[in-house]
From Swiss-Prot:
Transmembrane segments: none annotated. Residues 1-88 form the GST N-terminal domain. This is Glutathione S-transferase Mu 7. Glutathione binds at residues 7-8, 46-50, 59-60, 72-73. It comes from the Eukaryota. Keywords: Cytoplasm, Transferase. It comes from Mus musculus (Mouse). PROSITE patterns: GST_CTER, GST_NTER. Conjugation of reduced glutathione to a wide number of exogenous and endogenous hydrophobic electrophiles. Its EC number is 2.5.1.18. PANTHER family: GLUTATHIONE S-TRANSFERASE (PTHR11571), GLUTATHIONE S-TRANSFERASE MU 7 (PTHR11571:SF269). Substrate binds at residue 116. Homodimer.
Length: 218
C-alpha cells in the first residue's frame, strides 16, 4: 500500500520530503490541498479533513505509512531516513546530521518570516547583508566532502539542497563565492532519480510559499 504525503500544492516544507521519496523510489501518492485566494485565503480543503486523519498533532505536511501517521517535516524525513538507512553511519556523521538539520531549519524560518512579512521590502536588505555569512558557515561545514555528513548522502542533504537552492532563487549570486556549495547543488541535481523527477509534471519547485506570502507565492 503506498504512503500518503499530504501538503499544500506548493513547494514549502514538502520539497525535501518529495525529493527523498523520489530518490528512494518509494511507493507514495500525494494529497495536495489548495488554498483560496485573497482576502479570505480559504483553507477549508485542509480544515475539513484536519481532525479526521488520526494525526496526533494535526498539521501539514503529514505522512501516512500504514499504521504510522507522522507530522512535522523533519520527523517525516527522519522516519524515512531510518527506513532507508540514510541517517549517517558513524557517531560523527550522525552528529553532523543533527547539527545541520537544526541549523538549516533556523535559517529556513528566518527566510520564511521575511517573505511573509508585510514590510518585506524594508527588511530584505538586512537579510541580504547577513546572507554571505550564513552561506560561508555552510561552505566551511561541507568542506571537501561530497555530502554534508561525509562520503554518503543522508536525509539532511535533502534539506540542505532545499534551503541552499531556495536562497539562490531569492538572491541569484549568493553562492558565487562558495564553489563547493554550487558543486553540492549540481551533484544533488545530477542524481539520476532526482534529475528524472525534475523532468516530470509532479515536480513542484514553485510556488515557494502560500498565497499569504509577500514574496514567493507564485
Amino acid at each position: 500500500m503506498p504512503m500518503t504525503l499530504g501538503y499544500w500544492d506548493i513547494r514549502g516544507l514538502a520539497h525535501a520530503i518529495r525529493l527523498f521519496l523520489e530518490y528512494t523510489d518509494s511507493s507514495y501518492e500525494e494529497k495536495r490541498y489548495t488554498m483560496g485566494d485573497a482576502p479570505d485565503y480559504d483553507q477549508s480543503q485542509w480544515l475539513n479533513e484536519k481532525f479526521k486523519l488520526g494525526l496526533d498533532f494535526p498539521n501539514l505536511p503529514y505522512l501516512i505509512d500504514g499504521s504510522h501517521k507522522i507530522t512535522q517535516s523533519n520527523a517525516i524525513l527522519r522516519y524515512l531516513g531510518r527506513k532507508h538507512n540514510l541517517c549517517g553511519e558513524t557517531e560523527e556523521e550522525r552528529i553532523r546530521v543533527d547539527i545541520l538539520e537544526n541549523q538549516l531549519m533556523d535559517n529556513r524560518m528566518v527566510l520564511a518570516r521575511l517573505c511573509y512579512n508585510a514590510d518585506f521590502e524594508k527588511l530584505k536588505p538586512g537579510y541580504l547583508e547577513q546572507l554571505p555569512g550564513m552561506m560561508r558557515l555552510y561552505s566551511e561545514f561541507l568542506g571537501k566532502r561530497p555530502w554534508f555528513a561525509g562520503d554518503k548522502i543522508t536525509f539532511v542533504d535533502f534539506i540542505a539542497y532545499d534551503v541552499l537552492e531556495r536562497n539562490q532563487v531569492f538572491e541569484a549570486k549568493c553562492l558565487d563565492a562558495f564553489p563547493n556549495l554550487k558543486d553540492f547543488i549540481a551533484r544533488f541535481e545530477g542524481l539520476k532519480k532526482i534529475s528524472d523527477y525534475m523532468k516530470t509534471s509532479r515536480f513542484l519547485p514553485r510556488p515557494m510559499f502560500t498565497k499569504m506570502a509577500t514574496w514567493g507565492s507564485n
